[in-house]
Design a protein with these regions (language model features):
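Membrane-embedded, hydrophobic transmembrane alpha-helices
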Residues: 1-70
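Active-site lumenal/periplasmic loops and adjacent helix-entry segments of GT-C-fold
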Residues: 81-218
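Transmembrane helical bundles and short interhelical boundary loops of multi-pass, membrane-embedded
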Residues: 95, 245-246
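Membrane-interfacial loop-to-transmembrane alpha-helix junctions, especially the N-terminal start
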Residues: 1, 71-76, 183-189, 241-245
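Internal/C-terminal transmembrane anchor helices
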Residues: 64-89
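Transmembrane-helix signature of membrane-embedded glycosylation machinery that interfaces
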Residues: 6, 173-182, 224-227, 231
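Membrane-interfacial segments
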Residues: 10, 14, 39-44, 180-185, ...
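Membrane-interface transmembrane helices that cradle and orient dolichyl/undecaprenyl
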Residues: 220-245
Length: 246
């Protein structure tokens, strides 16, 4: 979203060749920042003080067979949940056929507008859909799909995005439940139940394909899990003194 606002201001066209390198560097930077944060946390600072690096970061203890089985079962139920969510599309729908609803038609035209205009800003990037008026409209989904679509493949890219959003949905639900409870039954059942819910994904991604709204919805469980873990860690560091270190 930040890039969609910055690029028009800097007169940089929104296309894969200009956006993907920035996203790639951001990913690498995030990984490096996480690694430094982890090292700072387990080592009590950045100074080695004569301690070997391997000892400073701690030796990773291999997980046992029981834990490995639980992880495998969890990912197995995530796969089942995804297949349940995606089966109507995979078994019936042709990826080359546009969804016969008014909302998907609007959003596919939005992707076309970005491909032609090279402007993905929420502050007017879809102006061609509003008679040239630069109105505010959230363009996160449109901007992302435009990176993978060509002028003749917007329909296919949009339909594939439904499958990607379904995967994010069931993974996020599993992540959220894993930080809320230690119940293995709940953890294994959640992705399967989540894949069969009527509102999401059946209605939002199969019946009406409300892609931008669905994008916001599927991100909620995973982001909630991240904030819960971060909040617990911050609370623990404050409780035991020393303040929040990372």
């Amino acid at each position: 979203t930040v890039l969609t606002v910055l690029y028009p201001a800097l007169e940089i066209p929104w296309e894969a060749s200009t956006v993907m390198p920035v996203l790639g560097m951001s990913t690498v930077g995030g990984a490096v920042a996480w690694g430094l944060s982890y090292f700072h946390r387990v080592n009590g600072g950045f100074a080695l003080n004569g301690v070997p690096f391997r000892e400073a970061i701690g030796v990773r203890v291999p997980i046992g067979g029981r834990q490995a089985a639980i992880r495998a079962a969890t990912w197995g139920t995530i796969l089942v949940g995804f297949l349940l969510a995606a089966w109507p599309l995979l078994s019936v729908a042709d990826p080359a056929n546009p969804v016969q609803q008014w909302d998907p038609t609007f959003h596919q035209n939005g992707v076309h507008a970005i491909l032609y205009g090279k402007d993905a800003s929420p502050f007017g990037g879809l102006h061609e859909l509003y008679g040239g008026r630069r109105v505010y409209y959230p363009t996160g989904w449109h901007a992302f799909v435009a990176l993978f679509a060509r002028y003749d493949s917007v329909v296919q890219a949009s339909n594939v995005s439904s499958l990607a959003l379904m995967a994010v949905w069931v993974i996020g639900l599993a992540a959220l439940v894993s930080v809320l409870t230690g119940s293995r039954t709940a953890l294994l059942a959640t992705p399967i139940i989540g894949g069969m819910l009527h509102n999401m994904p059946a209605d939002a991604l199969t019946m009406y394909n409300q892609w931008p709204n669905s994008t916001g919805t599927v991100l909620v469980p995973g982001l909630a899990a991240v904030f819960i873990v971060a909040g617990r860690r911050a609370a623990a560091e404050l409780r035991f003194g020393g303040g929040i270190r990372s």
